[in-house]
Amino acid sequence: MFHHSTHETAAPRIWRVGTLTYTAGGIAALFCWLLWGDFAWSLKERAAASVATLMIKSFEVSDFVYGLIILTIPNITNIILVPIVSYRSDRHRGRWGRRIPYLWMTTPFVTAGMIGIGASPFLGRQLMEAVGPEHISYRAAALTVFCIFWFMLDFGTTLANGIFVALVNDVVPRNFLGRFFGLFRGVSLIAGILFNYFLFG
C-alpha cells in the first residue's frame, strides 16, 4: 500500500479590473506609480497657484479682476469642458487605451502655461516694445500675456484632473478604490506640507 503525499501551494491571489489582472506586487507597483504622479501633480498645483497669485497681484489688478481671472474662469471651464472631454474619452478606443492619449494631449498646455506665466514680465515688456508704449502700458501688456498662459494652464489642468480620476477608476480594482483615494488625499496633503515648509520655512 502506497501513500502519496501532496504538497499544495496556495496560488497567488489575483485581482481583476476589466481586462487587467494584478498580483499583490502588481497592485503595489500600480499604487506607487499613480501616487508618485499625484505627488508631482500636487506640487505643480500648489506652485502654480502661489506663483499666479503673486504674479497677478504684482500687476495691481482690482479684486474683481483677480477673482474673475483666477477663480471664476477656471470654474467655468471646469463645468463646460470636463463633461465633453470625459464623454469622448469614455468612448475612445486605441492602442494606448481611453485615457493616456487625452493625458498626453493636455501636457503641452500645462507645460507651456507654467513656463509662460513665469516669463510674463519679460514677454509683457517685449509685447509693449513691439506694439509701442503709446498704445499699451507695460502692466497691461504683462497682464495680457499672463492671462493667455494662465488660460492655457487652466485648460490643461482642468482636463488632466478629470481624466486622471477616470484613469484611476479604470485601472484600480474596485475593492481598492477607497484605500487608494485615501492615500491619494494623504499624498496631496504631504505635498502641500513639504511645499509650504521649504518655500516659507
Segments predicted by a language model, with ranges:
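Cytoplasmic membrane-interface "Motif A"-like loop-to-helix N-cap segments
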Residues: 91-112, 128
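Loop-to-transmembrane helix entry/capping segments in MFS-fold secondary transporters
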Residues: 63-65, 143-144, 174-184
